[in-house]
Amino acid sequence: MIIGIGSDLIDIRRIENSLQRFGERFVNRCFTDIEIAKSDGRKNRAASYAKRFAAKEACSKALGTGLAQGVFWKEMGVVNLPGGKPTMQLTGGAAARLREMLPVGHRAAIHLTITDDFPLAQAFVIIEALPVAPAEGTV
């Protein structure tokens, strides 16, 4: 069952301006080490950061909190599954909020799509609650 949906659309030039104006301070405040390594290695660095920024905004909306109520930028990070599909990795207050949302006997799956077409970057997040299979030998 779907328990959260969020989307965000951002102007890449806004992130480009923040990178130029605030540099490392902006990057280190908003992005995880994995995101920094991934984005800094890209040809279009600003677009890469913009997609990840939009993903964080979309995820915070799917959590139902926005960037408030104990949910912070660096607690939501874009990571890739072994096949390359992007998803969100949550820690701290973001992970706690996700646990609060989950019905008993369910686990979360976070679906993420990110894209860019200059000057825009977009992200869409769906949080799904999936039933956990009972352990063998239990009733």
Swiss-Prot record:
Main location (coarse class): cytoplasm
GO cellular component: cytoplasm
Keywords for this protein: Cytoplasm, Fatty acid biosynthesis, Fatty acid metabolism, Lipid biosynthesis, Lipid metabolism, Magnesium, Metal-binding, Transferase
InterPro entries in alphabetical order: 4-PPantetheinyl_Trfase_dom (IPR008278), 4-PPantetheinyl_Trfase_dom_sf (IPR037143), ACPS (IPR002582), Ppantetheine-prot_Trfase_dom (IPR004568)
Localization of this protein: Cytoplasm
Cofactor or coenzyme needed: Mg(2+)
Annotated NCBIfam families: acpS (TIGR00516), pantethn_trn (TIGR00556)
UniProt xrefs under HAMAP family: AcpS
Protein role: Transfers the 4'-phosphopantetheine moiety from coenzyme A to a Ser of acyl-carrier-protein.
Family statement: Belongs to the P-Pant transferase superfamily. AcpS family.
Name of this chain's protein: Holo-[acyl-carrier-protein] synthase
Protein's organism: Sinorhizobium medicae (strain WSM419) (Ensifer medicae)
